[in-house]
Amino acid sequence: MRVSVSGPAAAAVPTAGREPSTSGGGAVAASGAAVPGSVQLALSVLHALLYAALFAFAYLQLWRLLLYRERRLSYQSLCLFLCLAWAALRTTLFSAAFSLSGSLPLLRPPSRLHFFPHWLLYCFPSCLQFSTLCLLNLYLAEVICKVRCATELDKHKILLHLGFILASLLFLAVNLTCAMLVHGDVPENQLKWTVFIRALINDSLFILCAISLVSYICKITKMSSANVYLESKGMSLCQTVIVGSVVILLYSSRACYNLVVITISQDTLESPFNYGWDNLSDKAQGEDGNGGDYIVFGMVLFLWEHVPAWSVVLFFRAQRLNQNLAPAGMISSHSYSSRAFFFDNPRRYDSDDDLPRLGNSREGSLSNSQTLGWYGTMTGCGGGTYTVTPPLNGPVTDTAPLLFTCSNLDIRNHHSLYVTPQN
C-alpha cells in the first residue's frame, strides 16, 4: 500500500511516555480519541477477512483452470497467481496485526523488524500490483494482435514484452534499493530524498502503464470483431472496458496523489494516514495513530487496494467456455451438423492432423448406414417414400450435396444421383 495524505504531521522520535503526535490540531485528536480500540480491531478483522476471501477466490480459480484443462502458463493464470500472492501477504499482515490482544503493532512497521520481512510485508505487495497492471496491458495487446492478425504486430510483441518486463524489474529494483537504504543508518535529509526519488519513479511507472492501458482500450473499442474474440474467451467488451477503467482510475489517482503530496510536504517523513507504508521509515515508529486516522486509512485501503484487486480477479476468473459460437458469429471448426453443406462446409480448412480423428469418428456411422460417400440409386416406392440401394462393390468417393428434394422427383421415375451423408 502506497498512500500519502498531506498534513503537518511531524516525524516523532520514539520516547518513553511521549504522547502520540497527530496532524490537524486538537479537532483531529479529539475525533481520534473518540474512536475506541474495539472499532480499530473490528476494522482490522474486516480487512483481514476481505483479503482472505480474495485469497480463497483466486486459489479456487486456479484450481478451476486445472479442472477445465486450460493453459497452465497464460495471462489469466499469471494474473490470478499474482493476486493470490498479494492477498496472502496482506492477509498475513492484518492477521498478525489483530492477533496480539487487540493491538495494532504491525500496521506500523516496528523498528526491530528485520529487513526482509519488513520489505516483504510492506513493500513487495506494491510490486505485485504493478506487475498485475503490466500483465493486463500485455493481455489487451495480445487481443489486438489476435483480432487484427497482422504480422507487423507480432514483430512488435517481443519488444512489448521486453518493455513491460524491464519496467517491472525497474520498479522492483527501485523499491528494494530504497528499502535497503531506509533500513540502514541513513541521515534524515538523505532519507527524505530517497523517499522522494522512490515515489517519483514508481508512481511515474504506474501513470505510464495506465496511459498505455487507456490506448489499448480505445483501440479495442474501435474493433468490431474484438467482442467476438473476447466472448470466445468467456469475456465481453463491456467487461473489459469497465475493469480497465476502474483499474486506470484508481491506480493513476493514487499515483498522482502520492506525487503531489510528497512534493508539497518534503519537510515531513510521515503522514498519519499511511502508517509508514509509503515512506518505509522506521525512525518514527514510536507513535501510534489515533482511531480517526485509522478509519480513514481503512477507507483509502478499501478503495485503492480491494476494488482494483477484486476487479482483476473477477475479470480473469476461470469459466467453462461455450464451444457453440454460432450466436456470437463464429462456427467452431470441429462442430458436427447433420445437414449437408455446399459452400459453407465448416471442415474445409481442417488440417491433415484432423483427418485420422474424423475418419475414426465416422466408422460408426458407416456401419449403420452404407450410403456414406457411395454412388447409389433412389427408386420410388408406394406411399411417397424412397429407398436407396447402394452398389455392393462400388467405389468409395467423396460426399456430394443433394441438389434436389423429394418434391422434385417423380415417384414413377428411377434416378441415379449422389446421396448425402446422414449422421
UniProtKB/Swiss-Prot annotation:
Chain residue ranges for the region called Disordered = 1-24
Transmembrane region(s):
43-63, 78-98, 115-135, 162-182, 194-214, 242-262, 295-315
Protein keywords: Lysosome, Membrane, Transmembrane, Transmembrane helix
Give residue spans on the Lumenal membrane side.
Answer: 1-42, 99-114, 183-193, 263-294
GO cellular component terms, alphabetically, are: lysosomal membrane
Keyword Coiled coil (UniProt): no
Q: Where in the cell is it found?
A: Lysosome membrane
Question: Which stretches of this protein does UniProt put in the Cytoplasmic compartment?
Answer: 64-77, 136-161, 215-241, 316-423
Skewed-composition ranges (Low complexity): 1-17
Question: What topology does it adopt in the membrane?
Answer: Multi-pass membrane protein
Query: In the UniProt record, does the keyword Membrane occur?
Result: yes
The main location class comes to membrane
Tell me, in a sentence or two, what this protein's role is.
Answer: Lysosomal integral membrane protein that may regulate MTORC1 complex translocation to lysosomes.
Q: Which PANTHER family does the record match to this protein?
A: INTEGRAL MEMBRANE PROTEIN GPR137, INTEGRAL MEMBRANE PROTEIN GPR137C
Report what the protein is called.
G protein-coupled receptor 137C
